[in-house]
Regions:
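Short, surface-exposed amphipathic charged segments that create phosphate/polyanion-binding patches used
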Residues: 77-87, 147-151, 221-226
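GT-A fold catalytic core of metal-dependent nucleotide-sugar glycosyltransferases
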Residues: 68-74, 88-140, 153-155, 162-163
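Active-site-proximal specificity loops/subdomain of glycosyltransferases
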Residues: 48-98
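N-proximal low-complexity "stem/linker" segments adjacent to membrane-targeting elements
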Residues: 1-29
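Short internal beta-strands
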Residues: 36-44, 134-135
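Short, charged, surface-exposed secondary-structure boundary motifs
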Residues: 76-78, 141-146, 216
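Catalytic core and acceptor-binding pocket of nucleotide-sugar-dependent glycosyltransferases
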Residues: 133-139, 153-244
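A structural signal for isolated positions on well-ordered beta-strands in alpha/beta enzyme cores
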Residues: 7-9, 37-39, 65-67
Length: 244
């Protein structure tokens, strides 16, 4: 019997190579019965480093693919002043346009994530008819009236996204998000996450909060046993430490 295959996506530049290794190590350690195909868009990383990444991934019965992004694809996309973002944050918009047609579903993960459980449940979530599944932010950016997102709990965090490739492409999510970024740079705070929330308003599957736990979701001043109990059953811990 062949192990289950899950398609993952991660994008980063040379500054996040070490966090990428932390991410995939946590995935392999907690999903030993699963094989992965990791689709990556990486810049600033040399061929030697890519070969080392490939060797590491193959040791865990998995594969990795590298995709190239053209500078013109992200030219003119805004990075807010005094922001810690780089243009690499925009790379994730391009995965559905780049992966082979055999990939029907793709789980995108930011590189500031540690996986502490089985990814099968999130990967097999039913998102038929929707371009994406994501976790709504209820303790950070609850809504964004300036973007036309008034409902509390409607704004989602794009650090974990389960992409339905055919629906995403059919609805031209990437193209519409990029167009928004070009048309309304003055509205952009959380870069492509803002754009995706605009074009996917009322059009995504809300995933369980256990699949994207940020520091803002964790209660403060609990005893150690309280934190242990809170984290029980959680799957993805996302170290998004900038307050929204």
């Amino acid at each position: 019997m062949y192990p289950e295959l899950i398609h993952l996506a991660a994008s980063f530049d040379q500054n996040y190579l070490t966090p990428f290794y932390v991410l995939i190590t946590s995935i392999f350690d907690n999903n030993k019965e699963t094989s992965f195909h990791i689709h990556t868009i990486v810049t600033g990383v040399g061929n030697q480093e890519k070969e080392e990444m490939q060797q590491f991934v193959r040791q865990h019965n998995s594969n990795i693919s590298f995709y190239e992004i053209a500078p013109k694809d992200i030219e003119g996309l805004v990075i807010p002043e005094q922001s810690y973002f780089t243009r690499a944050t925009y790379y994730r918009l391009f995965f559905p346009l780049m992966v082979p047609e055999t990939v029907k579903k793709l789980l995108y993960l930011d590189t500031d994530i540690v996986v502490v459980g089985d990814l099968s449940e999130i990967y097999h979530t039913n998102i038929i008819g929707f371009p994406v599944g994501a976790v709504a932010e209820v303790n950070a950016t609850k809504n964004r009236p300036d973007l036309g997102i008034d409902e509390i709990g409607a704004y989602f965090n794009a650090g974990v996204m389960l992409m339905n490739i055919s629906e995403w492409k059919k609805q031209e999510i990437s193209e519409r998000a990029i167009q928004f970024l070009h048309d309304f740079p003055e509205k952009v705070v959380w870069v492509d996450q803002d754009a995706l929330n605009v074009v996917l308003k009322d059009n995504y599957v809300k995933l369980s909060a256990k699949f994207n736990v940020t520091p803002f979701d964790i209660p403060r001043y609990l005893p150690k046993s309280g934190y242990h109990n809170f984290l029980k059953g959680k799957i993805i811990i996302h170290y998004a430490l900038r307050e929204h």
